[in-house]
Amino acid sequence: MEEYKDTLNLNTTTFSMKGNLSVNEPKTYAKWQEQQVFKRMQNRKDNHGDFTLHDGPPYANGHLHLGHALNKILKDIVVKREYFKGNKIYYTPGWDCHGLPIEQQILERLEKEKTSLENPTLFREKCRDHAKKFLEIQKNEFLQLGVLGDFEDPYKTMDFKFEASIYRALVEVAKKGLLKERHKPIYWSYACESALAEAEVEYKMKKSPSIFVAFGLKKESLEKLKVKKASLVIWTTTPWTLYANVAIALKKDAIYALTQKGYLVAKALHEKLAALGVVDSEIAHEFNANDLEYLKASNPLNQRDSLITLGEHVGLEDGTGAVHTAPGHGEEDYYLGLRYNLEVLMSVDEKGCYDEGIIHNQLLDESYLGEHVFKAQKRIIEQLGDSLLLEQEIEHSYPYCWRTHKPVIYRATTQWFILMDEPFIQNDGSQKTLREVALDAIEKVEFVPSSGKNRLKTMIENRPDWCLSRQRKWGVPLAFFIDKRTNKPCFESEVLEHVAHLFEKKGCDVWWESSVKDLLPPSYQEDATHYEKVMHILDVWFDSGSTFKAVLEDYHGEKGQSPSDVILEGSDQHRGWFQSSLLIGCVLNNQAPFKKVITHGFIVDEKGEKMSKSKGNVVSLDNLLKKHGSDVVRLWVAFNDYQNDLRVSQTFFIQTEQHYKKFRNTLKFLLANFSDMDLKNLERSHNFSPLDHFILEALETISVGVNSAFEEHDFVKGLNVLMAFVTNELSGIYLDACKDSLYCDSKNNEKRQAIQMVLLATASKLCYFLAPILTHTIEEVLEHSQVLCAFLQAKDVFDLKDISVSEKLHLKEFKKPENFEAVLALRSAFNEELDRLKKEGVIKNSLECAIEVKEKALRENLVEELLMVSFVGIAKEKLSETPAFTLFKAPFYKCPRCWRFKSELENTPCKRCEEVLKER
């Protein structure tokens, strides 16, 4: 039989079964960079639409991790998908370069070197160098993921032109009357020694003291109530703020019970408090909260007066119904203070320690000076003496600094804010608040998943004013001058534009380097002594939030359209970049700077737990790339429901590798079996068999399904449809049935050539669908197939377009074989019987079989092809009690060439093979 092997069409391909991705991919990616492939993609002549994905900037600090890979790969898949659809694509990657993490890195380095650097310009220079270094590192790491974009000219928030653009966005906010300097409580990170915006705060569980404290009513107040003894009971988990208490808030119209022992609490909570042992159970008197307003109690910590007020924020679900109020340490307290003209006491310094204000205002004794507020709590509780009614420890959700992971405090300081509820003039002349404009804008944005809409909406509805100022050095300054004569900022256009021009020319380091006089325009320089610089820097969320202006609008469409078609980030950006971009877009243009928001989950381990070095469950991106290659990592991203958290472990990547091998091996089989095609046959029409029509119809059906899923960015759904087709219809049915013709028919046999055209069409569709995900692999496929390139009129992966299979194959319609489902049912029953006979040792394979079927409507040729048997007969009689088919050994000899049992003489070829051999 060996002598016939060379007469078979056992075609091969140079496309390897093993991808050896970690070795070959870097070469491909380097070639793409050298060939400036992204520019070529943008300049493709037949682009028929525009698509802009605006990149949310990663932070230029540290190496990439798997979360970065997830984000950038998803963006790359979305962008490439639009490109292969025929759109002109715009994608400019960018980096967030300013901010605290880089400052901390430099400070730690200086501490190790035992040097200090007071000069802000030199300090900023070190920060800039650090950002440059990691920007290049991350850029190269992104390229190793097969990500394409305008990496030749990425955006960097520290570029001079960019800093000027950020500043001009800030100027627009100021000109519209939405920028105000205020003294009010804000989140304060004592670890960073800086104010924080809401987006920079994360909540964690924290153990805190929970205390109930009695504030005795003053003599005049007791007389008004006509009682001899009464103490309002407050509950707090921040004993350190008691020094700054100036009021107690009650719930309007609520009834308050005075117990026999003289404790005053909300009646609705009395029974609960009595059970805890905070107060006694017998009620002596009841009062309406409205009758208690403006009475005074005494702070047991320092004997200062505490005014009784009514507050809308007071609830009756827990606590005592009497809320400790310190306007210097709480936002609700602050706003209540504005209503009642309360004093704002705040004697805590930048490091979170009590300052000299506690002595000047007689708030605490001198021993507390310089002590950290959290450390001081134990002594404060002891100092309360008999006024402390109950002390417990509770675990509750508490705000933490997201950079240092240390708890934050509320601290009243003078900061700059963007006002959420100040009306400003819209483009149409009407007036709305920023909150109203943002909420209207959200309604016009598409969210994937749709739940993101309500999430962002709720955050905008409830968010406070945006605290913009930071007490740091590495950032864009709030470059305004305060006129010392009026104590107001100078918002004159001439001054502001002059500063913006300086930033564009020299960078914003000039704000630290130059004097006030040198920073002012010539017409203002005579009055330079009347002005002083604001030395705060901007919240970095303002930097990144204004990137749509700097990248899309300032370049007038060269780098994409604004609003962008899509932004795509992790779900945590609802409180970060999505919000900051939305708010700045609504100030500048009265609309969202994006049309669609896509969000993805986080990377977790196989148990669903967050990855951390301390847990030892971090999966290294670098190790994954070395072991599996970037195309496998990309396939893992696409084969997951990215809208939820993605579980990762070596097990999951091994599964993904199996998926990859299935696609690769299928493509290898297809390439090998049309490799001997004459290119002249590509354009002519062919006579396709019923089986060909079956697979072509299936290909058309799944193409609709995959396109629909991909259009909705549901890549896992699309890939599952594609994988099911490859596994079931293609490999499981069609390819097996075609092998005899492919291997054993003559090279120019019409049936074989028709099959090859089907294989070409199938390979084309697989390449088109997989190209956005497995770009390197599809590039490799095309490199190894002149026939496929000719069929697609493509020299490489970037020439790929979707094809119409029916047009390419000159078919008006796909004619699925009649009774095909019946044949498949017969095949299933046959395979069961075949397995039984194999186990019993009766036969070795299906070719030894002949089959007689009782269904006359079934095509004999189709049954023979699908069941891969050597003979099919139709039963003369159709009796209901007989089985659907009868199986018996083929009545002829085995052909030594094709192995079918169709030879009339032993060890001689069958008729078909004889004819093929004659042609040779």
UniProtKB/Swiss-Prot annotation:
Keywords: Aminoacyl-tRNA synthetase, ATP-binding, Cytoplasm, Ligase, Metal-binding, Nucleotide-binding, Protein biosynthesis, Zinc. Zn(2+) binds at C895, C898, C910, C913. The keyword Ribonucleoprotein does not apply. One of its GO terms (molecular function) is isoleucine-tRNA ligase activity. Signal peptide: none annotated. One of its GO terms (cellular component) is cytosol. PROSITE patterns: AA_TRNA_LIGASE_I. InterPro entries: aa-tRNA-synth_I_CS, aa-tRNA-synth_Ia, Anticodon_Ile_BEm, Ile-tRNA-ligase, Ile-tRNA-ligase_type1, Ile-tRNA_ligase, M/V/L/I-tRNA-synth_anticd-bd, Rossmann-like_a/b/a_fold. Binds 1 zinc ion per subunit. Monomer. This is Isoleucine--tRNA ligase.
